[in-house]
Every structure is written in C-alpha cells, then in structure tokens.
C-alpha cells in the first residue's frame, strides 16, 4: 500500500487493519499519517481512545496494555508506538526494557477494536530478528522512501496548487537549495510563504530569500566551496557569521568534515561507474546532497579533497585539546590550505 492509498483509506471511513508498520525517514509523512490515524477517532473521543507512546522513554508494555483495552464509549481505539528501535540492528542499550514476548503474543491475536500503529523512522529493519519477521507478517506495511529532488518539486507544487498558489521557478530552486530538498523543511515554510504572498497568491524569489533561512548544512556547503576555491577571506567571513549565529565550532567542523568525506567518497565511486541513484543508496545520503557532491567533486583533484579533510581533522583535535580560538584555528587552516607556509 502506498502513502496516498493509505491516506485515502483512512479518510474513507472503511474498516482498518489491526496492525500497521510505517517505515522510513520522511518526517513530514510520518507526522501526516499520525494525524490521519488520530482523525479516524471522532474528536470528542480522542482523549480516551487515541494514544501515542515514545518507546525511547516508555516501556512497550504500557502501549500494549492500552492496545488491549476496550474503547471507551466508542467503536475503536488507535494506539501509536514511536521509535521501536528494537526492530533495528542498533546495539546501543535502551533506556527502558521492552517486553517483546508480550508483543509476539499480541501480534498472533490483535485486539479487534484496536488499530496498533508502529512508526519506525529507519531506513531498514533487522530482518533476521524473529519479532521483525512476525511484525511484517501481521502488519500492513507502508515504506516511506526518500523523495528525489524531482519528487520534492512535484509534491510541493501540487500542495501549492491545492491552496490556489503558484511559485516562480527561481523561487522554487532557491527554496530547494536553502532546505537541502528536505520536504519536511519545505512544508514547514509553506504557510509562511503563502501568507507573505497575499493577495497575489504567487510566491516570488524575494519571498524565499527574505523568509527562509539556509540550513546549517547548506551554509557549510557554501563554506566548502570557498575552502576549495582557496578563498581565505570569504571562507573566514562565512565561518565568523556561523559563529555569530551561535553555531557550535565543533559542530561546524564535524559537518565540514562530513561534506569533504562525501566529496571524496563520491569522487572515488563515480570513477568506478556508480550512478547518482546508486551513490545515494550506497552512501545512505539524500539524493540531492549526492547531486551537489557530484557537481562539486568534478572541479577538484582528489589530493585537494584529502588535504582539506586531513586539515580539518587536525583542527578538530586542536579544538578538543587546546584553548585556542576556533576562528583562529580555522583561519590558520585556510591560510595553510591556500598554499602559504603556516604551521597550525
């Protein structure tokens, strides 16, 4: 079943399955589906017959107890279980204990009046686990795969059209760039952009540039380009702006290293014939980020990418082991990378 089919089914009033498994890292659709499941319960009954539990902090048994209870003056109960990390291969010890034996028993005979929904925000589950096999057998599964840039464009434009709005191509391009083609971020900006664009119902470039802030990742991507261009003054100025915006120096450096790591991986694998789609799935990176990395890596030598990555690793060590000013450390890194004989 697709996302669209499930949303239509939830709105139709038709009978629902006993168990659903919503997989994938598309936060926008996770939230939209949870709202749709909640709305199958009449508003007057939602306080008693709808519940959502975060399994990172709440034992599974609490959610199952709720699922096994009869609805209170209503026809059905909906119970949502968020972040069931025990379905993955994650080895980090959980904050709470989960009774998987009780879940196995429940799945063999679900409560007829309850709709139990697992929201699993992961790329994949550990298919070797008995509980995963049993859940997939018992549940109706919906997989929220990553949207390509084209999918994001089409979906966002379709949502605007439903509201009787249009958007300039250059405005949409800028919005995608500033949000890293993250549909959740774009949809979070939609209402604000529409309100700004009244009464014309048309979103222009100035609305996007005036209202939508770039993500830290996009700012760091701009910083990467200045580093590789050996634009010391421009790179240091942007780095200073990030610090003034209260971004943590270690976080900036970590994202910088991650960007250079992605450029190196992309360059090496592209030479081996990997397509953009295969790169995204292999590296587990959003297709839009891979697209930008492919465009960037073509302009630079692997030796420069490696040198920048190692230089940033050195900056990280010094940030952690000395009291030197982060901006000074970055400035010295840039001076050295640009070709001058300076020892950091």
Question: Residue locations for each model-derived region?
Answer:
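Conserved beta/loop motifs at nucleotide-recognition and modification sites
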Residues: 1-344
């Amino acid at each position: 079943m697709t996302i669209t089919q499930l949303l239509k089914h939830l709105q139709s009033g038709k009978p629902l399955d006993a168990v659903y498994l919503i997989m994938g890292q598309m936060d926008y659709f996770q939230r939209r589906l949870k709202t749709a499941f909640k709305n199958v319960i009449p508003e007057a009954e939602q306080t008693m017959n709808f519940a959502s539990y975060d399994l990172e902090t709440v034992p599974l048994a609490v959610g199952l107890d709720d699922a096994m209870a009869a609805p209170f003056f209503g026809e059905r109960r909906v119970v949502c279980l968020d972040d069931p990390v025990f379905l993955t291969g994650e080895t980090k010890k959980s904050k709470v204990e989960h009774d998987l034996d009780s879940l196995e028993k429940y799945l063999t005979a679900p409560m007829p009046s309850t709709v139990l929904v697992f929201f699993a925000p992961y790329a994949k589950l550990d298919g070797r686990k008995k509980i995963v096999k049993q859940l997939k057998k018992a549940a109706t599964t919906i997989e929220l795969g990553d949207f390509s840039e084209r999918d994001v464009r089409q979906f966002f434009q379709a949502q605007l059209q439903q509201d009787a709005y249009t958007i300039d191509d250059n405005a949409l391009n800028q919005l995608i760039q500033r949000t890293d083609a993250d549909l959740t971020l774009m949809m979070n900006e939609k209402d604000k952009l529409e309100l700004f664009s009244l009464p014309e119902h048309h979103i222009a470039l100035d609305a996007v540039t005036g209202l939508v802030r770039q993500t830290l990742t996009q700012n760091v991507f701009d910083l990467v380009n200045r580093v590789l261009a050996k634009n010391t003054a421009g790179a240091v100025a942007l780095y200073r702006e990030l610090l003034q915006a209260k971004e943590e120096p270690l976080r900036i450096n970590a994202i910088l290293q991650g960007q250079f790591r992605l450029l190196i991986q992309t360059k090496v694998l592209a030479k081996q014939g990997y397509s953009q789609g295969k790169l995204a799935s292999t590296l587990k990176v959003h297709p839009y980020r891979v697209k930008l990395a492919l465009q960037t890596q073509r302009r630079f030598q692997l030796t420069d990418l490696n040198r920048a990555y190692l230089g940033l690793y050195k900056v990280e060590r010094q940030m952690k082991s000395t009291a030197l000013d982060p901006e000074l450390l970055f400035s010295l890194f840039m001076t050295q990378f640009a070709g001058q004989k300076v020892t950091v």
